[in-house]
Swiss-Prot record:
Catalytic activity: 2-amino-2,3,7-trideoxy-D-lyxo-hept-6-ulosonate + NAD(+) + H2O = 3-dehydroquinate + NH4(+) + NADH + H(+)
Enzymatic class: oxidoreductase
EC number: 1.4.1.24
Organism of derivation: Nitrosopumilus maritimus (strain SCM1)
Family from the record: Belongs to the archaeal-type DHQ synthase family.
Taxonomy of the source species: Archaea, Nitrososphaerota, Nitrososphaeria, Nitrosopumilales, Nitrosopumilaceae
GO biological process, one term: aromatic amino acid family biosynthetic process
Task performed by this protein: Catalyzes the oxidative deamination and cyclization of 2-amino-3,7-dideoxy-D-threo-hept-6-ulosonic acid (ADH) to yield 3-dehydroquinate (DHQ), which is fed into the canonical shikimic pathway of aromatic amino acid biosynthesis.
Database matches in HAMAP family: Arch_DHQ_synthase (MF_01244)
Name assigned to this protein: 3-dehydroquinate synthase
Top-level taxon in the UniProt lineage: Archaea
Amino acid sequence: MSKSRELIIAPKGSQAQLSKLLPQLEDEGIKMIYLDPKKLGKKKTKLQTVYPSNNANYVVLEKENATKPKGKKVGRKFEVLSNTDIENILTIAKKGLDFVVVEVKDWKIIPLENIIAKLHKIHTKIFAVARTPEEVRKMFSILEVGVDGVIFNTSSINEVREAMVYLGTRSFDMKPAKIIDIKEVGDGERVCVDTASMLHKGEGMLIGSRSNFLFLVHNESVGSSFTSPRPFRVNAGAVHCYTLSPDGTTNYLSEVETGSEVLILNSKGKARRATVGRSKIERRPMLMIKAKAGGEIGGIIAQDAETIRFVKPNGQLVSVTHLKKGDTVMVHSKPATGRHFGMEVSDEYILEK
């Protein structure tokens, strides 16, 4: 059974910024925040609070001998500077703490490895403090067990989304789209994205000629009668196509390179991140494919080869060389908005053809 882990957001900014951010956090599936419950006011929310307050759901005790409020989870916050601090955490945790909040200012990995190893066998949860999405990723992967929760100091919803990909809880709305046009368009430059991860059947990248209409392009884990499986690769599409990044912004496929991070999704929309090991741009015969989902129409230009596959609503794969008008494939689509350097601009008018 997989370990339950939480991304706990510690929002920064004014009350007005907070009022805007909290509903967004709920929409993204965040369940816990590190915040004084007083700042929630009388607003109804499902968000649970962690804070040095008896009104919080998870009460951070400020003194070791403080009275424990009934019916609440209780913990302590610790700053770790040496192994002595780690031993102190273990001693106090054994006295009945439900959780510990750990802040390590330098050499984060080794101290947290030691804390996880020592607290792993007791029922005290470990919440670690992070300041960047990259720190969130490291803390969730330490010793392959990771901490139970990461308190992430941010007021950026894009950073929250990026961190959720590292947690493995980010998801995208996927829907079936009907193929309405297929046409050979001659040669063009296409991009093969070789990741540093093994990709599973059903997984791929979101690719499209429009940022609001992206096709799920499957990886090459299946192979063909002429090629061996390459389960790390996605033959993504033409250089102009968009793909989504973990932070929610878009990149052109021509911008993807060694060290870039890309989103890997399955047909249900569950996302994880992968690091790019290599990006290959080569000239190949290309196909233009258009599809319609609801009132939106989008397209993609992909290589004309049997190893490029889309995913059907039933999970089956279909090669672009066998694709027909009327077939349905999985896409991520939404109403069109403008983009400025990859960032969504919600009020800008845009028409793409």
